[in-house]
């Protein structure tokens, strides 16, 4: 393990304790109607209709691309969990969780091996600024902490350097930037 990576992990462990108690209190005040549902033949079309604003398209792949990536990953014996994000029965966003990197991702960062990732998160432009993104991260982390692919030490994600909204959202959950990049995006890690 290189020194820079080890230092990042130490910062993650320290920050995690500080953030956990804050987020537990805040989540108790959030509307509990938001939930996630696995993408299936019944809901895929309504999820494909969701999109971010024109100015946000550089920050997140379209849902059709994400669902194709999930399919390609799963058929290559990898792990991808695509979900619709719902407020009651209304679709408001999309999330995808990944695990490991196996043979299907040639240029995977070291942190991907044996760890979970919050691979995609988007909230439709019509449902933003309502706290859904923040609550969706909590739902995603709850799913990850059920360890559907087995135990893991970390959850990681990446975002464009210009995406300050994502940076602040993930930082509020204790994700710490490692200083590493993948495909031009900043990698941030959370100890589970």
Question: At which residue positions do the language-model features occur?
Answer:
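Conserved active-site alpha-helix within GNAT-family acetyltransferase domains
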Residues: 134, 161-179
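Acetyl-CoA-dependent GNAT
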Residues: 34, 38-119, 124-126, 143, ...
């Amino acid at each position: 393990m290189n020194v820079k990576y080890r230092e990042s992990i130490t910062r993650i462990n320290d920050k995690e304790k500080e953030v956990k108690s804050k987020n537990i209190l805040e989540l108790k005040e959030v509307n509990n109607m938001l939930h996630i549902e696995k993408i299936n033949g019944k809901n895929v079309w309504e999820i494909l209709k969701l999109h971010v604003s024109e100015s946000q398209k550089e920050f997140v792949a379209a849902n059709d691309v994400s669902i194709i990536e999930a399919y390609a990953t799963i058929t290559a014996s990898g792990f991808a969990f695509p979900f619709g994000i719902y407020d009651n029965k209304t679709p408001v966003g999309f999330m995808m969780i990944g695990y490991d990197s196996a043979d299907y991702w040639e240029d995977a960062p070291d942190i991907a091996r044996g760890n979970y990732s919050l691979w995609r998160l988007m909230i439709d432009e019509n449902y933003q600024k309502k706290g859904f993104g923040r609550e969706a991260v909590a739902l995603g982390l709850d799913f990850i902490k059920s360890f559907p692919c087995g135990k893991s030490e970390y959850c990681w994600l990446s975002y464009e350097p210009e995406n300050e909204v994502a940076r602040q959202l993930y930082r509020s959950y204790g994700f710490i930037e490692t200083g590493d990049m993948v495909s031009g995006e900043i990698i941030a890690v959370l100890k589970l």
